[in-house]
Amino acid sequence: MTRRKLLVVALLTAACGFPQGRPALPAKPKLVVAIVIDQFRYDYLTRFRANYSGGIAELLDRGAVFTNARYRQFPTVTAVGHSIFLSGAMPSLSGIIDNQWFDRGLNRQVTSVSDEATQLLGGAGPGSSPRRLLASTLGDEMKAASRGNCRVIGISLKDRAAILPSGHAADGAYWFDPRAGAFVSSTFYFKELPEWVRGFNASRPAEGYGNAQWTPLAASPDYPDFRKKMPGGGPELYVALEASPYANEIVEAFAERAIDAERLGGHAAADMLAVSFSANDYVGHQMGPDSAEVRDMALRVDRSIGKLLAFLDRRLGPGRVVVVLTADHGVAPLPEVLAERKMPGGRQPAKVVLDAIQGALSGRFGEGRWVAGASTAGAYLNRELIASK
């Protein structure tokens, strides 16, 4: 979905009925804003449409809506969806095959963005990077086309959702660390956090939601009422915020700060900002797509996106920004809800499945570490042990 304000001048000029010179072309956009709502099913656009009044409503009303635009990738998880979004590369080409998997070369589990050659900035431990991404992204191509004279920034709660869409040549990717209650980055991008990031973190935005009461934004006879109180502060609050609308509000506020500090839209070539709202995914996994909480998250992220679009209009003016909105994947109903509908299914913890594989192979071929690792797709078997038998 893209904002359509760029067409207005050309259409008005073409409508004039008297001869004149070649009409002036509309000004080129100065900023591309690529927005992902994590785990946002397409039917949320129509199911909750009557209650949208912010950014989603604006994009639906004034943008182009592509009802059948999708990639048929597997697995449908955050890392894969975010890597495809601005690269167009399927997992077999991008190298991003899951959120995490077993790397046979390293003989251990890795994540899509883990990188022990880097350090976390703003927190403790190894950093993250796009080094496992084998494809270029839109941001990389914009950097190449402008000979480096543009800015590319990625922002999200999750490291992979900030890093993978923004690509290799990004000027920075930032994500929220619940251990620190702050936005962090990696030495892959720079030696220390920019001053504006340190200033934002110093304001301790997460603490402002201590003891906040999350209640439905709009009542509905189809959904039950709920009340959820946030912890008072500290790490307990930071973790709880991730599965609440307040996390998206913090991400939006950080995006506004990035636009000003990085002068996005103020360079000779068009800049790019990739923003992923991840809190919807955390709530969806906990509560399921049929829940009142998921509905409320949709209505509230609509407001957050609307706030961001209004900020962009004030800073850059109408028609100078191209906005794209998509999701990285959807979600199936909770097994318990399916059971109520007399549908087959259920829950089976991954450990139970892996232990069953391990036990079956040990019983048939003898003791040994038969299962070397795992991913969403299944188990990785120990090839060396198999060869030795």
Question: Over which residues does each language-model region extend?
Answer:
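Hydrophobic h-region of N-terminal signal peptides that target proteins for export
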Residues: 10-19
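Active-site-proximal N-terminal segment of extracellular/periplasmic enzymes that hydrolyze or transfer
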Residues: 18-64
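Beta-strand elements within well-structured catalytic alpha/beta cores of enzymes
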Residues: 29-41, 59-60, 85, 142, ...
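Short, structured active-site-proximal loop/turn typified by the sulfatase FGly-forming signature C/S-X-P-X-R
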Residues: 46-93, 151-155
